[in-house]
Regions:
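Non-transmembrane domains of secretory- and envelope-associated proteins
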Residues: 2, 11-15, 154-159, 171, ...
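Beta-turn initiation residues at beta-strand->coil junctions
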Residues: 58-62, 82-87, 106-111, 178, ...
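An acidic-aromatic
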Residues: 70-140, 217
């Protein structure tokens, strides 16, 4: 009889411990889900409602290559400027300007300049577009983007979220190696993303990669400016300096 009571008591304690663990897990996942949802909402509002902004991303990869991507948005024109420099000083530059009905690309590699022009209806810019019938693209980094509630909850489970004050601003620090929305390299072991709490904007990404058994880091820094892009900023390079290449 005493043994039965003892077993019953142990079982109740075990069930209580399991219930507490489950409650803690649910509370943690709920908090993460709310935070990711808030970030997604803020970035989506910026993406869909901002028609004049500048964004720059600077990369330093595990092989010490440096690259920068600048994006200029003004009205219905998007200009993308990508530059990459190797450790030995070689430089490549691509400028792509997207209009509603055409796209022009200017490449410059080792001093050779080539221009391509594509006469085609281009994708529209926007996130979470309801009743979408055309292809779309986004420009602002959104580590919390999700296509469904299920995806949001799964990412909340596999993503650690901490808060930290940096230079007087509050940040969310998102870390994961399984988040379906993070853009990993094939040898990535972990990615950490710094998100400004007030705006939802990503300001820094640190990606740890396994390079032949050695853990190295890739850094991406983000800079944003709103409502200061001019028509000169989105202008084309001098076409006369480029050789026109026919597109097949």
């Amino acid at each position: 009889m005493e043994k039965t009571k003892s077993k019953t008591k142990c079982l109740k304690i075990l069930l209580l411990v399991i219930a507490i663990i489950v409650c803690i897990f649910i509370a943690i996942v709920t908090r993460r889900t709310i935070i990711l949802s808030e970030i997604d909402k803020k970035v989506t509002e910026l993406e869909n409602n901002s028609n004049n902004f500048y964004m720059k991303t600077t990369f330093i990869d595990e092989k010490n290559y440096t690259a920068s991507i600048e994006r200029y948005i003004k009205d219905d024109v998007s200009k993308l400027v990508m530059e990459k420099t190797t450790p030995d000083g070689k430089n490549a530059k691509i400028t792509e300007i997207t209009y509603p009905e055409k796209r022009k690309m200017f490449t410059e590699v080792n001093g050779v300049k080539v221009m391509h022009e594509y006469n085609e209806k281009t994708a529209i810019r926007g996130a979470h577009i309801e009743k979408q019938t055309e292809s779309s693209y986004t420009t602002i980094s959104n580590p919390a983007y999700s296509m469904s509630k299920r995806e949001l909850i799964v990412n909340a489970i596999v993503t650690s979220i901490k808060t930290k004050k940096i230079d007087g601003k509050d940040y969310y620090i998102l870390s994961s190696k399984m988040n379906t929305n993070f853009l990993y390299n094939t040898n990535t072991t972990k990615m950490t993303i710094y998100v400004e709490k007030d705006t939802g904007l990503t300001t820094k990404i640190v990606e740890k990669v396994n390079e032949n058994g050695e853990i190295k880091e890739i850094y991406k820094d983000f800079e944003y400016k709103f409502n200061n892009v001019t028509y000169e900023d989105i202008s084309e390079p001098d076409n006369s300096e480029y050789k026109m290449q026919e597109n097949s």
